[in-house]
Amino acid sequence: MNSHYQNHSLENFFSTNLSATDDAVFAGIQAEFTRQNEQIELIASENIVSKAVMQAQGTCLTNKYAEGYPGRRYYGGCEHVDTVEAIAIERAKKLFNCEYANVQPHSGAQANGAVKLALLQPGDTIMGMSLDAGGHLTHGARPALSGKWFNAVQYGVDKETLEINYDDVRALAVEHKPKMIIAGGSAIPRVIDFAKFREIADEVGAILMVDMAHIAGLIATGAHPSPLPHAHVVTTTTHKTLRGPRGGMILTNHEEIIKKINSAVFPGLQGGPLMHVIAAKAVAFGEALGPEFKTYIDSVINNAKVLAEVLQTRGCDIVTGGTDTHLMLVDLRPKGLKGNKAEEALERAGITCNKNGIPFDTEKPMITSGVRLGTPAGTSRGFGAEEFKLIGHWIGDVLDGLVENPEGNAEVEQRVRKEVKALCSRFPLYQ
């Protein structure tokens, strides 16, 4: 290298790759890549980003502090990161057809926290879906900040249909008069009627917040009705079905709300934004605006339906009888299995999912009576209906093997793992 560095170690600082400087961390990263490349990912909240999104996160933007917002920073030298953040904002607004966007939240939980900081006071009553019915920790669950700082009232699902009963939601809202109603969740397989939620919110004078983290990609393409015409404020993650970097975002059509949101995100809840992640968000939003993304989401939904149907033929009970989205809940009680044991057995077979409570579950959260499955990651690597039929039967084989031997059926699991690895080799990552 032709340079003026007096110190050889400084020259290395700017030129030496990770593999040469930290073999322990590099080995961990390589091992994780091998796991992702050779296993089938069915965790509904996970996805696989494009190489471009990954590259954006590994740029010099990680060096830049940029407290504030484009054109209103507390540091100099922000003209270029201003451009990048402005691109992310404009693309987000176009993608979801809304007036205002804040792309700085580090996560979906941070986005939800910022909305509450902006629009509520400690002790206010909030109403969200209970965790066991398919809600999220940040919607008022007792262990979370939202359940500690606010008077959290929780709605569930109908005992017969296992879907949201809007009459029950209305009755609860009329009884408790919440300041905010939260719609959305982390394990809802059916379409949510945001218009009905807004009717209920208006009746009791509540703010309607929609957390669309799981279904943002579906909403972006029109595969699920948008909450933006109905909600006062919408939060989302930027990964999951949106297939971007891990992060959060807040959207609204109300100027007075975005002013409060912006102040709540910074300086209220966060300091400097992660500009390298915001750059990756901009890249992902650009990808989602393309026609290929709609094709992708259509495949995600179709693959989920195919997977659910195969599992039903294998004796699995799918909560609500199917899915309209990217995910499904599998009730394992008919097979006499627990979610934690099923998760472990499937992972031994090369299929990753997560144990998950089902509505009215009597098991503890670390045991559960079900597993949650999703198709976004598998679809991202190219799996179609035929592949998901195979996957459904492999899951059925592993679960049936577990019924035969509750401690694990090594013969079945090893056979399935070999077949999984062979399938994954046909759809390699980042080649």
Curated annotation (Swiss-Prot):
Keywords: Amino-acid biosynthesis, Cytoplasm, One-carbon metabolism, Pyridoxal phosphate, Transferase. Pathway: One-carbon metabolism; tetrahydrofolate interconversion; Amino-acid biosynthesis; glycine biosynthesis; glycine from L-serine: step 1/1. The record marks H239 as: Plays an important role in substrate specificity. GO terms for molecular function: glycine hydroxymethyltransferase activity; pyridoxal phosphate binding. It catalyses: (6R)-5,10-methylene-5,6,7,8-tetrahydrofolate + glycine + H2O = (6S)-5,6,7,8-tetrahydrofolate + L-serine. The modification N6-(pyridoxal phosphate)lysine is found at K240. SUPFAM superfamilies: PLP-dependent transferases. Its cofactor is pyridoxal 5'-phosphate. GO terms for biological process: glycine biosynthetic process from serine; tetrahydrofolate interconversion. It is an enzyme of class 2 (transferase). Its main location: cytoplasm. Its EC number is 2.1.2.1. The keyword Amino-acid biosynthesis applies. It holds the Pfam family SHMT. (6S)-5,6,7,8-tetrahydrofolate binds at L131, G135, H136, L137, E256. HAMAP family: SHMT. Belongs to the SHMT family. NCBIfam families: PRK00011.1. Catalyzes the reversible interconversion of serine and glycine with tetrahydrofolate (THF) serving as the one-carbon carrier. This reaction serves as the major source of one-carbon groups required for the biosynthesis of purines, thymidylate, methionine, and other important biomolecules. Also exhibits THF-independent aldolase activity toward beta-hydroxyamino acids, producing glycine and aldehydes, via a retro-aldol mechanism. This is Serine hydroxymethyltransferase 2. It comes from Vibrio vulnificus (strain YJ016).
